Amino acid sequence: MEFDKQFFSSVEKIVELAEQLEKDLNKPDLTFEQIKAINKELKHKQPLVVKFKEFKRLIDQALEAEAILENNELKELHDEAKKELERVRSVVPEYEEALKLLLLPIDENNQKNVIVELRPAAGGDESCIFLADLFNMYRNFCSNKGWKLQINEMIPSSVGLNFVSFEVNGVDVFAKLKFESGVHRVQRVPATESKGRVHTSTVTVAVLPQLEAVEVHINPADLRVDTYRASGAGGQHVNRTESAVRITHLPTGIVVSCQEGKSQFTNRDTAMKMLRAKLWEKAQNEQLSTQAGLRKSQVGSGDRAEKIRTYNYPQNRVTDHRIKLTVNKLNTIILGDLDEIIEALQADEKKQQLENFFS
């Protein structure tokens, strides 16, 4: 029976270690933190253990079939044994690939909710208009996924948006939206263009995981909290109370603000979420400057030539330059139909992880 015996042996050892961890849970002297750590590891390893046991049963069945074929006294069973052997051979590559994927390290941020920030870059007014288009695209995408989108801060311009920050809560939010970080480029004829020339503009998108307070320590003494009257939509209430909150992290100079909530308490809570995300980003940027998801490596300067994706309106085309994927249905993508692009990016991420892990 042909299969990767070295790989099989390596996975078997990992499974044996997981089974030993399960036994360790019965030790009476474990601390709460040790139990928590073991359970976390077992939760991560459980899918691998289950898949490997299925694979091992198949290999055992194949070896048994080979033994029957080598025994001339069991010729009446040879036909069935051949069928069994062929069946197992046909699924071995599928199982080996599945096990490899289960061996990959899990990005714990994938399950987290996110904070998304959109800023106009090159292109003036057209960039602000495109920013509003992208915001609507993400709003529709989130609605289609059943995710909750909440605006933290929105600054309108005369023709579109100058800035928007929003949080998204749901299942596997960061796992999907993290690929949106970077420079998005649009090519189209602006409504104000009288000669029909195509203009190029860009918007930068940053996607940050929402972190719990225990994940990012913030000393209250390092904060300056200012309150002010909210502006914009919200009715008379926003003009009567100082519900808007601005928080400055003095050691880093990072400033966050929120005015979309109805109360100062709500806005402060949201602003603290934003601050934790920005401090996480700063720490990651300093320690792992090449890690995916960082604004410095993903967003860049916003220059027209520096982009992750292009939206070409005249050709109804969207091209993701990271994986050289072109989809000719911009008209539906800009309305929130992002699944095809995101699924392709996820597949490429897994491919790259496999190559790096087993190289």
UniProtKB/Swiss-Prot annotation:
Subcellular location: Cytoplasm
Residue numbers carrying N5-methylglutamine: Q236
Keyword terms: Cytoplasm, Methylation, Protein biosynthesis
Gene Ontology MF: a single term: translation release factor activity, codon specific
GO cellular component, one term: cytoplasm
One Pfam family per UniProt: RF-1
PTM (free text): Methylated by PrmC. Methylation increases the termination efficiency of RF1.
Primary site of residence: cytoplasm
Family statement: Belongs to the prokaryotic/mitochondrial release factor family.
This protein's name: Peptide chain release factor 1
Organism for this UniProt entry: Mycoplasma pneumoniae (strain ATCC 29342 / M129 / Subtype 1)
